[in-house]
């Protein structure tokens, strides 16, 4: 568990990172650096989006799988790294 904490601290220390969260397979936040309401909102919506993206990738090619999802808007850049049991979500300010 210490390795996970170290990794999250390292990610959080990068310039521009607003917050990180780890979400379980059901979309429930396990670890977060954001406030509760923001965490619940992002976790629920990004979990749904990631599951839909994963399903779409599999529909296109059943041998393939989603490994990373990056969403960039004017305000934020959201990166999602899905695993079998968890999602790692990082929210940062987009680089200019």
UniProtKB/Swiss-Prot annotation:
Pfam families recorded for this chain?
Robl_LC7
GO terms (molecular function) for this protein are:
dynein intermediate chain binding
Keyword Acetylation present in the record's keywords: the answer is yes
Q: Where is the chain membrane-spanning?
A: none
Q: Which InterPro entries match?
A: DYNLRB1/2, Roadblock/LAMTOR2_dom
Cysteines paired by S-S bonds: none
Family per record: Belongs to the GAMAD family.
Q: What is this protein called?
A: Dynein light chain roadblock-type 2
Q: Organism source for this protein? A: Bos taurus
Q: Gene that codes for this?
A: DYNLRB2
């Amino acid at each position: 568990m210490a390795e996970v904490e170290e990794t999250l601290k390292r990610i959080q220390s990068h310039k521009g990172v607003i917050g990180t969260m780890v979400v379980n397979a059901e979309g429930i936040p396990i670890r977060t650096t954001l406030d509760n309401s923001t965490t619940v909102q992002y976790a629920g919506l990004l979990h749904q989006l990631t599951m839909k993206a994963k399903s779409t990738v599999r529909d296109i090619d059943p041998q393939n799988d989603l490994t990373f999802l990056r969403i960039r808007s004017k305000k934020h850049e959201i990166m999602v790294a899905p695993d079998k049991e968890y999602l790692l979500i990082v929210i940062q300010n987009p680089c200019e």
